[in-house]
Every structure is written in structure tokens, then in C-alpha cells.
Regions:
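Sec-dependent N-terminal signal peptides
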Residues: 4-14
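N-terminal signal peptide c-region/cleavage motif recognized by signal peptidases
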Residues: 15-19
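Long, acidic (Asp/Glu-rich), low-complexity accessory segments flanking structured domains
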Residues: 20-76, 83-116, 121, 174, ...
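Structured catalytic-domain cores with a bias toward divalent-metal coordination
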Residues: 78, 89, 148-150
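A cross-family signal for N-terminal binding/gating loops and helix N-caps
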Residues: 81, 130-132, 297
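Acidic, His- and aromatic-enriched active-site or binding-groove loops in soluble protein domains
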Residues: 100-102, 143-158
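Catalytic cores of phosphodiester-bond-cleaving enzymes
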Residues: 105-149
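Surface-exposed substrate-engagement region within the catalytic domains
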Residues: 151-283
Length: 313
């Protein structure tokens, strides 16, 4: 009896230790990557509409909180904001408020994570999601220029920015051109529901080319196979981003066919196939890959394989 109890205790401790080690590896997976590697030559997992846990079939895109996503290894976040009557920026997906505020819930979470894990870097994509543009610009500008936060921000974007220059900091990519003074880069030429080349401009006007696959609107769920094919074509393009190239790639694996099928229905099919297609054994720069429902088995497999691809020879 005593022997059985001892074995149970040992097994429990082993499971807890293994779990803790795995969690720590996900929290600091960038730690073992060389400072000299350009950020654009990494495979980086991200989430589409990262804060959208509410909204049902039409609007929910995630099943994990932002903190849970961070701990899983997600390093790119797609945050949609709307200026609210309480003079804060609320996180929205379309018309659905996600019960989160940028100033009090999101940015403090990101900066605290970076303080605790200074080997990591976050890429945060910001987009206005409805509401008054002037209020949005004013509130976001005030927040991003507050000296309380600016030490965590990468002020100027450049195409060949190195991981070592980004550790412990946030690189902002602004989908809108609404701020005169901003950290990071603004997007110019991002077409809706398309694969396209986008120009990233920093505050000094320096330009970088970003290849974006964001074809998300389909007529019916049976077209999920077409979405997978589109994703794989774009990932193949990223694969040929040789060491002397500084072209950036963002691939969105998210899609919808409303009113027939929403993001979760597509994610069930797309993530399963994508998890099989992204092979951790083959070293290649996949670029940034944005997925829905990161907490599912297939979602976690995609994230794990993207991370592991950075360490394969």
C-alpha cells in the first residue's frame, strides 16, 4: 500500500514538473534564438481577433484568454479597438464588446508578461473597429505616448530589425493611418478579403514590403478546402524568404461563410489540415501565422509546430 502511494506521489510530481517545464518553454521559446536573426525570418504564431471570446457563432474567434494565449506561445496579437463613452478603448469584434479595455486589461497584461519574460517580443496589430475616428486617435495617441509605457515599445520599425533589438518590447503594426505620432509602423494598401502587398511605413517614412494573405469571406463551408489551398500557397511564398531577404509575411488562417458558417466551423476544418501541413521537422520561415481557436488540439499543434520550426536545421 505504501509503495503504491509513493509511486502515485512520484508520478504526480513528475507530471507537475513536466507541465511546469513545458509551460516555461512556451513562455520563453524565443530565448534560445540568436539575437542576430531578423524578426522577419522567424516562424511566429499569432491569433486573429485575439480578444474575441464572445459573440457566438458569428463573432467568436478564440477560446483562450489573452493571458492563456501568451502562455501557450502566441506572440502576435490582432487587437480591434473602439472608442467608448467612458473615454477608454474597448476591445470589439464588429459590434460585440469583449468586456476588455486596452488601457486597463490588454496593454498592462502585455507589459507585465514582457517584464517577467524579457527574452520575448510581442507584435501587436491595432485596428479601429467602428466608432468615432477622432476619439479613437486621441485616446490611442495619449496611451501610446505615455512615458509610463514607452520603454516597452519599439519606436521605429525597419525591415531588417533583429530579434535582439526587440526583446522585452512590443512592435506595433497599425492597420489604420489615424495617428500622426506612433511607435512601430502603419499599413498602407491593405486590401479587404485579399492576398496583397502592403507597405509598412515607420514615423520617418521608411518603407518595408509586407505580403498579406487575408482571404476570409467565403460563400459556404465547403469552400474551406479553398482557404487551405490559399494558406499553403502563401506559406510556400514565405518559405522562399531567403536569409538575404527582409520581406515580411502574414498569413491569416481565419475564414467565415456567414450566415451559413462562422469562424469556429471554418477553424475546425482549416486548423486540422494546417496542423498536418506545418511540419516541425522541416526548418523554414513560415512568417507570422494568425489562427482562430488557438486552444483546440489542432490550434495548439499549429502553435507548437511553428515554434519548433525555428529550431530545426
Amino acid at each position: 500500500m505504501k509503495k503504491t502511494i509513493i509511486l502515485l506521489i512520484i508520478n504526480t510530481l513528475f507530471i507537475l514538473l513536466t507541465s511546469a517545464q513545458s509551460s516555461n518553454q512556451c513562455n520563453e521559446w524565443m530565448k534560445e534564438i540568436a539575437d542576430t536573426l531578423p524578426l522577419c525570418q522567424l516562424s511566429i504564431p499569432g491569433t486573429h481577433d485575439s480578444g474575441a471570446l464572445d459573440g457566438g457563432e458569428a463573432f467568436q474567434t478564440q477560446d483562450l484568454t489573452l493571458e492563456e494565449q501568451l502562455n501557450l506561445g502566441v506572440r502576435v496579437f490582432d487587437i480591434r479597438l473602439k472608442a467608448c463613452e467612458n473615454h477608454q478603448l474597448g476591445v470589439y469584434h464588429s459590434i460585440v464588446f469583449q468586456d476588455l479595455y486596452w488601457e486597463t486589461d490588454v496593454l498592462p497584461l502585455f507589459t507585465t508578461f514582457l517584464e517577467q519574460h524579457p527574452s520575448e517580443t510581442l507584435i501587436v496589430m491595432l485596428k479601429k473597429e467602428g466608432g468615432n475616428g477622432d476619439d479613437f486617435s486621441r485616446l490611442l495617441s495619449q496611451n501610446l505616448n505615455d512615458t509610463l509605457h514607452t520603454r516597452f515599445f519599439i519606436p521605429h520599425f525597419k525591415e531588417d530589425i533583429l530579434l535582439g533589438e526587440c526583446r522585452g518590447k512590443i512592435l506595433f503594426i497599425h492597420r489604420d493611418q489615424l495617428l500622426e505620432k506612433f511607435p512601430g509602423a502603419q499599413c498602407h494598401g491593405w486590401k479587404d478579403n485579399a492576398t496583397c502587398l502592403v507597405t509598412l511605413k515607420d514615423p520617418h517614412g521608411n518603407e518595408t514590403i509586407l505580403s498579406v494573405e487575408d482571404e476570409y469571406q467565403f460563400a459556404e463551408l465547403s469552400h474551406a478546402k479553398d482557404k487551405v489551398a490559399t494558406i499553403m500557397r502563401h506559406l510556400e511564398s514565405a518559405k522562399h524568404n531567403h536569409t538575404n531577404s527582409h520581406k515580411w509575411h502574414i498569413t491569416y488562417a481565419s475564414a467565415t461563410a456567414l450566415p451559413e458558417a462562422g469562424p469556429q466551423s471554418f477553424a475546425t476544418i482549416v486548423n486540422a489540415q494546417l496542423a498536418q501541413e506545418i511540419h516541425a521537422q522541416t526548418h523554414r520561415p513560415y512568417g507570422i501565422v494568425m489562427i482562430d481557436f488557438a486552444g483546440t488540439t489542432d490550434g495548439q499543434t499549429i502553435i507548437k509546430n511553428l515554434i519548433n520550426s525555428n529550431f530545426q536545421k
